[in-house]
A protein has these predicted regions:
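Signature of Asx- and small-polar-rich beta-strand/turn repeats characteristic
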Residues: 1-349
């Protein structure tokens, strides 16, 4: 009776020996020399094919489960089935005081100054240069002596600046807007800085600001919500609702823009000195003459919070807990999951 081939081992030599033992016990091959070049080569091919098939089956099965998957694309995909979107890279953030003194002798000075979002600074960490910028409008009021202290819109003199290069990607919606995926080819995107706008047409100046579906509290057919998640190749894909239960969907021919920061993550942590890149123009109200001044910058908090993409170990740990919380904050585990999601760049799991 023929000996059964043992198929539990993936070792190439063991597979070849098992094949040889099996064939030697077949009457058709009783007097064959299996060490001869011809038969040995045939056994090598059979063993190699069996070895590769076994490895492929083993790898494929491992990639089918969250706990055993090794490829990032597989882990991210499994997390997605639990409603979990792994964290992207995050920008390092610092706070600065920003001011300048035009001089008490200067006449015809405006009462208020405003600087739009995107005012840039440079800094360095370990001899590498990084760009930081504001993410909101800041303004300053003349104190009566031509001194201007800039503040955020909520009145704070500590102005947050974020590391990264501002980028904008533009798309045009086609006919099948519900199933369209818009790919942003940037592995360094900070998802939290994304701003999505949908214009009525390519030439229209009117737009609707869309919100991230993750933070939407009430979703219906008119809710302007977007979905932004990591694609299998490490880029990011933008999509919209279905026009009913998941919110509004852009109409065909509309223009879609996404603005975001492309960041260096943890490399930019620890920046202390910030140099303004551009002057701030002060226009005299009466004459219309523009004066340009470099503001004085003082650091109140060095840059922190920059991080790499969420690790595979962190995704495996956090995604089941996130699924269990369902965005609630009731049990201690709910709080732990949501705190890790919000402040994961600042604390350890």
């Amino acid at each position: 009776m023929a000996t059964t081939i043992h198929s539990s081992s993936l070792d190439f030599t063991a597979i070849k020996n098992n094949l040889k033992t099996y064939l030697q016990q077949q009457s058709e091959f009783k007097d064959y020399d299996f060490e001869a070049a011809g038969l040995s080569n045939i056994l090598d091919v059979l063993a190699y094919n069996t070895h590769m098939n076994g490895l492929t089956a083993n790898f494929a099965l491992n990639e089918s489960f969250l706990n055993t998957a090794q490829l990032r694309s597989s882990v991210v995909s499994h997390a997605e089935t639990l409603g979990y979107v792994p964290a992207s890279k995050s920008a390092a953030q610092a706070t600065v005081n920003l001011s300048f003194n035009i001089g008490i002798d200067q006449e015809d000075v405006p009462e208020k100054l405003q600087v739009s979002s995107g005012y840039k600074f440079t800094s360095s960490v370990n001899d590498a240069s990084y760009t930081f910028q504001t993410q909101e409008l800041i303004e300053a009021t003349n104190d009566g002596n031509n001194f201007f202290q800039f503040q955020t819109l909520d009145g704070s003199t500590e102005i947050p600046v974020f590391e990264g290069i501002a980028k904008t990607k533009t798309f045009f919606a086609g006919e099948d807007t519900e199933g369209t995926l818009y790919i942003i080819p940037d592995v360094n995107m900070d998802r939290s800085t994304a701003v999505v706008k949908v214009y009525e047409s390519a030439t229209s100046g009117d737009f609707t600001s869309y919100i991230n579906l993750e933070v939407a509290t009430n979703i219906d057919v008119t809710t302007p919500a977007y979905i932004l998640k990591e694609a299998p190749n490490g880029y990011y894909e933008l999509s919209f609702g279905n026009g009913s239960t998941l919110g509004a969907v852009p109409t065909a021919g509309s223009k879609v823009t996404i603005e975001y920061l492309s960041v260096d993550g943890s490399n930019a942590n620890g920046a202390r000195l910030f140099e303004p890149v551009n002057t701030i123009e002060v226009t005299e109200p009466t004459s219309g003459i523009g004066l340009e001044r470099l503001p004085v910058v003082s650091t109140t908090n060095r840059s922190v919070g920059g991080s790499a993409k969420e690790s595979l170990a962190s995704i495996r740990k956090n995604s089941p807990y996130r699924y269990a919380t369902q965005n609630r904050m009731v049990t201690h585990a709910d709080y732990a999951s949501l705190v890790l999601r919000t402040y994961g760049a600042l604390i350890d799991d």
